[in-house]
Structures are given as structure tokens and as C-alpha cells.
Amino acid sequence: MNLNSIFGQFSPDYFLLMPMTLASMLMAISWLFFSNSTNWLPTRIGFSFLTFNQTIIKTIFQQTNPSSITWVPIITTVFILLFSVNVLGLLPYAFTATSHISLTYSIGIPIWMSVNILGFYLSFNSRLSHLVPQGTPSFLLPLMVIIETLSLFAQPIALGLRLAANLTAGHLLIYLMSTAIWVLMNNVAIASITLIIFILLFLLEIGVACIQAYVFTALIHFYLVQNL
């Protein structure tokens, strides 16, 4: 694809002799196997997805209370969405939407606001008491209220910024490493060592993509437990 051409986005892209359009279509069609089936027993793919979903729920909701059970579908959906976008963004010529704060804030801020509004609605006095830590001297009360209020409003900012910053840093490292491999192609020894480092870095970024999706949803669950 010619990145300097306006119509370059319509030209077919190839990765390891495989058309990227075909790979994207196969990946999209694969989600059909995760839809509800009319069979009495689930298929192997459906059972695998069900096991994966149950593992996510057990991992995120290790310490919870019965009041947060209704939030399980929402938080699980957010995790699967972030996990899919993060991992698919590592494909060549793929756009990683979660590396932009416009998307991460669009997901994090509404959920954070709804969780805190619910907390103030259910127990207004209890939520106000969190602004003043127990044992605070009287002369520090106004200052602690300001600090705790600022830290409360910093939660959604850090929530979205952490995800976008980690993915952006990882993509920059992959880009710089791949550029170094291309420049050092004439020197086989150095290029081979750089390629090995690049493969290890790519595997690390796959882990980062999974971990960041977990951290995002785990923090949402933590904020939820604080407000219930």
C-alpha cells in the first residue's frame, strides 16, 4: 500500500503472501461461531469461548459482593472489546483504536460516572465520608477534602490515559525495531539479533495488550466495589 497516495487504501495489502482483506474476512466470520447455537450441547468452539468467558469473570470478580453481579455482563463485554481491539491492533496495517484517548475516555468516563452516581445515590453520607480519611486532624480537613476530590476526578483520566499510553509506547517500540531491522539488513549478524529481539518484543506486546485490558476492567470493578 502506498501511504502517500490518497487511493492507496484501496490497494490490496499482503502479509506473508496472504491478502490482509481475506484474513480480515476470515477473522470476522469466525465470530459467527461464538453465536448462540440451537444444539443441546455446545460445540468445541462454543465450549472454548464459554470457558474463556468464565475464566474472565472468575479473574476479574475475585473479590466482589452480590450487589455487583448485575455489572458482570457490562464489565465482561468491555474486557472482550478491549482485548480484541488491542490484539488485532498488532496486525500489520491495522488501526489500534485503543491507542487513542478519544476511545479510552469514551469508554472509561461514562462507566466511571455511572458507578459514582450510583454510589452517591445508594449511600450519600458514606461516599462523602471517603473524602476525609479516618483520624485526620481537624486543621487538615479542608485540605484533605480538596485532595481526595482531585484524586477522585483523576481516576477516569488515569484510567483512559494508562491504556492509550502503554499501547502507543509498545507500537512505537515495534516500529523503531522493525525500522532498525530494515536499515541493518546488509549486516546479517546484527539484523538477525535485532530480529530475535523484535520477535520477543512482539510477544511482550501481545502480553501487554492482554494485561492492559485486564487492568482497565479490574479498576472499573474496584471503583464499583468502592461505591456499593
From Swiss-Prot:
Pfam families in the cross-refs: ATP-synt_A (PF00119)
Top-rank taxon, per record: Eukaryota
A single MF term (Gene Ontology): proton-transporting ATP synthase activity, rotational mechanism
InterPro entries given in the database record: ATP_synth_F0_asu, ATP_synth_F0_asu_AS, ATP_synth_F0_asu_bact/mt, F0_ATP_A_sf
Key words, A-Z: ATP synthesis, CF(0), Hydrogen ion transport, Ion transport, Membrane, Mitochondrion, Mitochondrion inner membrane, Transmembrane, Transmembrane helix, Transport
SUPFAM superfamilies (UniProt xref): F1F0 ATP synthase subunit A
Compartments where found: Mitochondrion inner membrane
Transmembrane spans: 14-34, 71-91, 101-121, 139-159, 165-185, 188-208
A GO-annotated cellular component: proton-transporting ATP synthase complex
Topological relation to the membrane, as annotated: Multi-pass membrane protein
Similarity field: Belongs to the ATPase A chain family.
SUBUNIT field: F-type ATPases have 2 components, CF(1) - the catalytic core - and CF(0) - the membrane proton channel. CF(1) has five subunits: alpha(3), beta(3), gamma(1), delta(1), epsilon(1). CF(0) has three main subunits: a, b and c.
Function text: Mitochondrial membrane ATP synthase (F(1)F(0) ATP synthase or Complex V) produces ATP from ADP in the presence of a proton gradient across the membrane which is generated by electron transport complexes of the respiratory chain. F-type ATPases consist of two structural domains, F(1) - containing the extramembraneous catalytic core and F(0) - containing the membrane proton channel, linked together by a central stalk and a peripheral stalk. During catalysis, ATP synthesis in the catalytic domain of F(1) is coupled via a rotary mechanism of the central stalk subunits to proton translocation.
Identification of the protein by name: ATP synthase subunit a
Species of origin: Pisaster ochraceus (Ochre sea star)
